[in-house]
C-alpha cells in the first residue's frame, strides 16, 4: 500500500505539471474532483491543482493564438475531453473556447490535452476506480455477512416454540379417590390447561426479549460503516451482545415455574382448604421441576446454536479478510505495473525500479527476477513464482508459469528448479514440485509434473530427485516420492513412480533408494520400501519391490538392508535395524520376519535363512539366522535371542527347537523336542526340567525336578520333589502325586502304571524299584535298592538316591534328585536335570549319553576318563566341574547339558540337532533360541496367553492355552483344552483335552 500511495501521488503531481502548457484544456478538473470525492489524494495536491489552474487561465487570456482552422473544428476538438468533470476552475476559463479564433487557412494545433490525458490522467483515474470498486465490493460483502448472521439469529428466535408436555394428573386424581376425596371430573383437564397456558406465555416472553435485543443490534449495524463493523466483530462485542439475549432467561423460567405451581395449587384449594395433602403437594412440585428443566434445556439448546453461528461468522470473516487481502495485493500490484512500465520503461537503472526489483513480483508485469513472482507475469527467477507466469527460477513457483527453478513451483508452470514446485508446471528442480509440472528437482515435487529432483515430488510428474516425490511423476530422487512417478531417489517415494532412492518410496514406482519405498516401484534404497517396487535400500522396503537395503523391507521386494524387511524381497543387507516380516530373504540389523533369508540384528521371522551380526530382535520366520534376537523360524541361526524355529542356533536364549545348542542363561522352558528346560518347566520331549519347576511335566521330557506341584501326564518319565498331582501319562515319574501312567516312577504317590517305581505310594507296575518310604509293594524284578530299591541293572545306588536308577549307568552318586533313565552313565552331584537326548554335552546337568566327557559328574559311558566323577562312556575325558550329565554322543558337556547330536552345549541346553544353543532354549528346528520361550514352530510368546500356534505364553497367563503351544505358566486360571501338557499354578478349570491334568481343582 505504501508503494501504491507513492505512485498515485507521483502520477498525479506529474499530471499537474503537464497542465502548465498554454492550452486551456490542460485544467485537470476531472481528476481533482474525482480524487477529492473519493478521498484518494491529500489536500495539498488538490490545492496545487487549483493554484496552477488559475494561473494558467490568466496567462492564456493575455496571449490568444490565431489558428487557420475553422472556429467550429477547433471548438469541437477542445470540448472532447471529459466535459462532465468540472470544478471551480472551469468557471474562470469558460470563455476560453469562444476567445480562440482559428484561421481557415491553417490546420488546428495538435490536441495536446487529449494526448496527455491518454498518456497519464485517464489511466490513473480508471485505475483508481478499479481499486475503489475492488475494496468497496469487499466492504459490502463483509457487511452483508454480518447482517445475514443477525437475520438468521432472528429467524431462530422466531422459530423457538417448545411445547411443555404436562404432567400425569389422572394418576393423582385416582390416588385421591382411593383416599375418599371427591374430585370433579374436569380437574385433570383444568390442570393440563394451566400447563399449556404457562408454557405459551413463557415462550412468548423469551421470544420477545431476544427479538428486541437482536433487532436493535441489527438496526445499529445496518447504519455502520465497514470499519466500525470490523471493530465490533474483532473486539468480540458483536458476539457478546448476541449472547446477552440469554443472560436473564433463567430467572424468567423460574418465575414461570412458580406461577404454574401456584395456579395448579389453587385448583385443589378451591375444592377444600384442608384437602392439600402430601400427595398433591409432591405431584405439583414435581410438575414444576419438570417444567423448569424442560425450558432450561430448550433455551440452552438455542443458546448453543446461536453461539456456534457466532463462532462460524467470526471464522468466515477472518478467512474472507485474509483471502481478499492476498487477492487485493496481487490486483493492486498488477494495476500499478501498467503505468510503471509505460512511464519509466526501465530507464532508471542506478536506483530505480529495475535494480530494486529484488522483492516479489506479484502482478502481471512479466518479470519478477530476484523476488517472488506470484502473478501472471511469466518470469520469477530468484523469487517465488506463485502465478501463471511460466518462470520462477530461484524463488517459489506456485502458479501456472512453467518455471520455478530455485524457488517453490506450486503452479502449473512446468519448472520449479530450486524452489518447491507445487503446481502443474513440470519442473521443480531445487524446490518442491507439488503440481503437475513434471520437474521438481531440489524441492518437493508434489504435483503431476514428472520431475522433483532435490525436493519432494508429490504429484504425477515423474521426477522428484532430492525432495519427496509423492505424486505420479516417476522420479523423486533425493526427496520423498509418494506418487506414481517412478523415481524417488533421496526422498520418500510413496507413489507408483518406480524410483525413490534416498527418500521413502511408498508407491508403485520401482525405485526408492535412500528413502522409504512403500509402493510398487521396485527400488527403495535408503528409505523404507513399502510397496511393490523391488528396491528399498536404506529405508524400509514394505512392498513387493525386491530391494530394501538400509531401511525396513516390508514388502515383496527382496532387499531390506538397514530397515525392517517385511516383504518377500529376499535381501536385507547391512544395518537393517527394522523388522523383516516379509519374504525378502535379508533382514540384517532389523527384524527379519518374512521369508527373506537374512535378519541380522533384528528379528528374523520369515523363511530367509540368514540373520548375521547384532540381531537383537527375534527371528520368527524361516530365514536361517537370528543372532542377537530370537530366531523363531526355520532360519538356522538365532544367537543371543530365542531360536524357536528350525534354524539350528539358539545362543543366549532358550533353545526350544531341534538346534542342538542352548548355552548360558537359559531361563525359559523347553516344551518341544529340544532336550532341556533349565529353570522353567520342561513340558515337551526335551528330557530335562531343572530347578524351580513348579508346574507339571506333561510332555515327553522325562524330568520335572524341584517344586513340581502339578502332575506328570505325559511321556516324560520323571516328576521329582513336590509333585502333588498325579502322573497319568507315559512320563515315568510321579513323586508326591499318583503315577498312573507308564512312566516308571511314582515316589510319594501311587504308581499304578508300568513305570518301575512308586516310593511312598503303591508300586503296582513292573518298575522294579520303590526306595525310601515306599508304602506300596514291589512287584517287579529289579534286584537292588540302596536306601530305596534298585530294581534295574545299574549296579550302583549310592547315598541320598531319592529317585530310581533305571538305566544302565551304574552310578547314582550324592544328591541325585532326578532319575537317570537313559544310557549316559553319569549323574553327579546336585544333578537336577536329566539329559535324555543324543546331544553329547550336559555340563551342569546329567551326562547320560555316549559323549566321552563328564567332568565333575559321573562318567558312565565308554570314554576312558572320569576325573572327579565316573566316565562310563567312550569319550576318553571327563575333567573337573562337570555338573551336568552328558547323555549323547557329543564328547563334550561343559556347563550346560547337550542333549542332541550337536557336539556343543556351553551354558544353555541344546536339545535339537542344530549344534549350537548358547544362552536360550531352542525348542524348534531353527538352530537358535536365546532368551524367551517358544512353544510352537514360530519362535516366540513371552508374557501373555498363547492361544494360537505361536509358541509362547509365559508369565501371567490368566487365560487358557487352547493351542498346540505347550506352555501356560503362572496364574493360568482357565482350562488347558489343547495338547500342551501344562497348566501350572492356579488352574481352576478342567482339563478337557489330551493333557491329562487339572491341578488344584480337579
Swiss-Prot record:
Q: Which UniProt keywords apply?
A: Glycoprotein, Repeat, Signal, Sporulation
Which miscellaneous remark does the UniProt record hold? SWP2 is a major antigen recognized during host infection.
The main location is: other
Its source organism is Encephalitozoon intestinalis
> Which stretches does the entry tag as region Disordered?
349-1002
Which portions of the sequence form the region 50 X 12 AA tandem repeats of E-E-G-E-D-K-D-N-T-G-E-G?
A: 357-998
Q: Where is the signal peptide?
A: 1-18
Which residues bear sugar attachments?
308
- UniProt GO BP: sporulation resulting in formation of a cellular spore
Outline the subunit composition.
Answer: Component of a complex composed of at least SWP1 and SWP2.
Sum up the protein's function in the record's words: Spore wall component.
Q: Which gene encodes it?
A: SWP2
- Top-rank taxon: Eukaryota
Location of this chain's protein in the cell: Spore, Perispore
> What name does this protein carry?
Spore wall protein 2
Which segments carry the sequence repeats?
A: 357-368, 369-380, 381-392, 393-404, 405-416, 417-428, 429-440, 441-452, 453-464, 465-476, 477-488, 489-500, 501-512, 513-524, 525-536, 537-548, 549-560, 561-572, 576-587, 588-599, 600-611, 615-626, 627-638, 639-650, 651-662, 663-674, 678-689, 693-704, 708-719, 723-734, 735-746, 747-758, 759-770, 774-785, 786-797, 801-812, 816-827, 831-842, 843-854, 855-866, 867-878, 882-893, 894-905, 906-915, 918-929, 930-941, 942-953, 957-969, 972-983, 987-998
The annotated regions of Acidic residues compositional bias extend over: 354-1002
Amino acid at each position: 500500500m505504501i508503494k501504491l500511495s507513492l505512485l498515485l501521488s507521483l502520477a498525479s503531481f506529474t499530471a499537474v505539471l503537464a497542465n502548465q502548457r498554454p492550452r486551456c484544456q490542460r485544467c485537470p478538473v476531472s481528476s481533482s474532483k474525482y480524487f477529492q470525492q473519493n478521498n484518494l489524494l491529500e489536500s495539498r495536491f488538490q490545492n496545487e491543482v487549483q493554484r496552477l489552474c488559475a494561473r494558467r487561465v490568466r496567462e492564456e487570456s493575455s496571449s490568444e493564438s490565431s489558428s487557420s482552422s475553422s472556429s467550429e473544428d477547433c471548438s469541437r476538438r477542445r470540448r472532447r475531453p471529459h466535459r462532465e468533470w468540472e470544478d471551480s476552475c472551469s468557471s474562470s476559463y469558460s470563455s476560453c473556447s469562444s476567445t480562440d479564433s482559428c484561421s481557415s487557412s491553417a490546420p488546428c494545433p495538435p490536441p495536446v490535452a487529449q494526448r496527455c490525458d491518454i498518456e497519464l490522467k485517464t489511466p490513473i483515474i480508471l485505475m483508481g476506480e478499479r481499486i475503489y470498486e475492488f475494496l468497496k465490493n469487499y466492504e459490502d460483502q463483509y457487511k452483508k455477512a454480518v447482517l445475514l448472521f443477525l437475520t438468521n439469529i432472528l429467524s431462530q428466535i422466531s422459530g423457538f416454540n417448545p411445547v411443555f408436555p404436562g404432567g400425569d394428573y389422572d394418576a393423582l386424581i385416582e390416588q385421591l379417590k382411593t383416599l375418599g376425596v371427591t374430585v370433579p371430573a374436569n380437574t385433570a383437564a383444568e390442570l393440563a390447561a394451566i400447563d399449556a397456558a404457562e408454557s405459551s406465555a413463557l415462550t412468548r416472553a423469551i421470544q420477545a426479549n431476544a427479538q428486541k435485543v437482536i433487532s436493535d443490534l441489527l438496526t445499529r449495524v445496518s447504519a455502520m460503516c465497514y470499519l466500525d463493523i470490523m471493530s465490533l466483530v474483532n473486539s468480540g462485542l458483536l458476539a457478546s451482545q448476541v449472547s446477552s439475549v440469554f443472560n436473564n432467561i433463567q430467572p424468567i423460567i423460574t418465575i414461570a415455574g412458580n406461577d404454574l405451581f401456584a395456579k395448579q395449587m389453587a385448583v385443589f384449594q378451591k375444592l377444600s382448604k384442608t384437602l392439600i395433602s402430601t400427595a398433591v403437594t409432591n405431584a405439583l412440585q414435581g410438575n414444576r421441576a419438570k417444567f423448569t428443566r424442560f425450558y432450561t434445556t430448550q433455551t440452552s439448546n438455542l443458546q448453543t446454536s446461536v453461539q456456534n453461528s457466532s463462532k462460524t461468522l467470526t471464522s468466515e470473516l477472518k478467512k474472507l479478510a485474509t483471502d481478499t487481502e492476498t487477492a487485493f495485493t496481487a490486483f493492486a500490484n498488477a494495476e500499478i505495473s501498467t503505468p510503471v512500465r509505460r512511464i519509466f520503461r526501465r530507464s532508471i537503472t542506478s536506483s530505480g525500479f529495475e535494480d530494486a526489483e529484488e522483492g516479489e513480483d506479484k502482478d502481471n508485469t512479466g518479470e519478477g527476477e530476484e523476488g517472488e513472482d506470484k502473478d501472471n507475469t511469466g518470469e520469477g527467477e530468484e523469487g517465488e513464482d506463485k502465478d501463471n507466469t511460466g518462470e520462477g527460477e530461484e524463488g517459489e513457483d506456485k502458479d501456472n508459469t512453467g518455471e520455478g527453478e530455485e524457488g517453490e513451483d506450486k503452479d502449473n508452470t512446468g519448472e520449479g528448479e530450486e524452489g518447491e514446485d507445487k503446481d502443474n508446471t513440470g519442473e521443480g528442480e531445487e524446490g518442491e514440485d507439488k503440481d503437475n509440472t513434471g520437474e521438481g528437482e531440489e524441492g518437493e515435487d508434489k504435483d503431476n509434473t514428472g520431475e522433483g529432483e532435490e525436493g519432494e515430488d508429490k504429484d504425477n510428474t515423474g521426477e522428484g530427485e532430492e525432495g519427496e516425490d509423492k505424486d505420479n511423476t516417476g522420479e523423486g530422487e533425493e526427496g520423498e516420492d509418494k506418487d506414481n512417478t517412478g523415481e524417488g531417489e533421496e526422498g520418500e517415494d510413496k507413489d507408483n513412480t518406480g524410483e525413490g532412492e534416498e527418500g521413502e518410496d511408498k508407491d508403485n514406482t520401482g525405485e526408492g533408494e535412500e528413502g522409504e519405498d512403500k509402493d510398487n516401484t521396485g527400488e527403495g534404497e535408503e528409505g523404507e520400501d513399502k510397496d511393490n517396487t523391488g528396491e528399498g535400500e536404506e529405508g524400509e522396503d514394505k512392498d513387493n519391490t525386491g530391494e530394501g537395503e538400509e531401511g525396513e523391507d516390508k514388502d515383496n521386494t527382496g532387499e531390506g538392508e538397514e530397515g525392517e524387511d517385511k516383504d518377500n524381497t529376499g535381501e536385507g543387507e547391512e544395518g537393517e535395524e527394522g523388522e523383516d516380516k516379509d519374504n525378502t530373504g535379508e533382514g540384517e540389523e532389523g527384524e527379519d520376519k518374512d521369508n527373506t533369508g537374512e535378519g541380522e540384528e533384528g528379528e528374523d521371522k520369515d523363511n530367509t535363512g540368514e540373520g548375521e551380526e547384532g540381531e537383537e530382535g527375534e527371528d520368527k520366520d524361516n530365514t536361517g539366522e537370528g543372532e542377537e534376537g530370537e530366531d523363531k523360524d526355520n532360519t538356522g541361526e538365532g544367537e543371543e535371542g530365542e531360536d524357536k524355529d528350525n534354524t539350528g542356533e539358539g545362543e543366549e536364549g532358550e533353545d526350544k527347537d531341534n538346534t542342538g545348542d542352548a548355552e548360558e542363561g537359559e531361563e525359559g522352558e523347553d516344551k518341544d523336542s529340544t532336550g532341556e528346560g533349565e529353570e522353567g518347566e520342561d513340558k515337551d520331549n526335551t528330557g530335562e526340567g531343572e530347578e524351580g519347576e513348579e508346574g507339571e511335566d506333561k510332555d515327553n521330557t522325562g524330568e520335572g525336578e524341584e517344586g513340581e506341584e502339578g502332575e506328570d501326564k505325559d511321556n516324560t518319565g520323571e516328576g521329582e520333589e513336590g509333585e502333588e498331582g498325579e502322573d497319568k501319562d507315559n512320563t515315568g515319574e510321579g513323586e508326591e502325586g499318583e503315577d498312573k501312567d507308564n512312566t516308571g516312577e511314582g515316589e510319594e504317590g501311587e504308581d499304578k502304571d508300568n513305570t518301575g517305581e512308586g516310593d511312598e505310594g503303591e508300586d503296582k507296575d513292573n518298575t522294579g524299584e520303590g526306595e525310601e518310604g515306599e508304602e506300596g509293594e514291589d512287584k517287579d524284578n529289579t534286584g537292588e535298592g540302596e536306601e530305596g530299591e534298585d530294581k534295574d541293572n545299574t549296579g550302583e545306588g549310592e547315598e541320598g538316591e531319592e529317585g530310581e536308577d533305571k538305566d544302565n549307568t551304574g552310578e547314582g552318586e550324592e544328591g541325585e534328585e532326578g532319575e537317570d533313565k537313559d544310557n549316559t552313565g553319569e549323574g553327579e552331584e546336585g544333578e537336577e536335570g536329566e539329559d535324555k537326548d543324543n546331544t553329547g554335552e550336559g555340563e551342569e546337568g546329567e551326562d547320560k549319553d555316549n559323549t566321552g566327557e563328564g567332568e565333575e559328574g559321573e562318567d558312565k559311558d565308554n570314554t576312558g576318563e572320569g576325573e572327579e566323577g565316573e566316565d562310563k562312556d567312550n569319550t576318553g575325558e571327563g575333567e573337573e566341574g562337570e555338573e551336568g550329565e552328558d547323555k549323547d554322543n557329543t564328547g563334550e558337556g561343559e556347563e550346560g547339558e547337550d542333549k542332541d547330536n550337536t557336539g556343543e552345549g556351553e551354558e544353555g541346553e541344546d536339545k535339537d540337532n542344530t549344534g549350537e544353543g548358547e544362552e536360550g532354549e531352542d525348542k524348534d528346528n531353527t538352530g537358535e533360541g536365546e532368551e524367551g520361550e517358544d512353544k510352537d514352530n514360530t519362535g516366540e510368546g513371552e508374557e501373555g496367553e498363547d492361544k494360537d500356534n505361536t509358541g509362547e505364553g509365559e508369565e501371567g497367563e490368566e487365560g487358557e492355552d487352547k493351542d498346540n503351544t505347550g506352555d501356560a505358566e503362572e496364574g493360568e486360571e482357565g482350562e488347558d483344552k489343547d495338547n500342551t501338557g501344562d497348566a501350572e499354578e492356579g488352574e481352576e478349570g478342567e482339563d478337557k483335552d489330551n493333557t491329562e491334568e487339572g491341578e488344584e481343582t480337579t
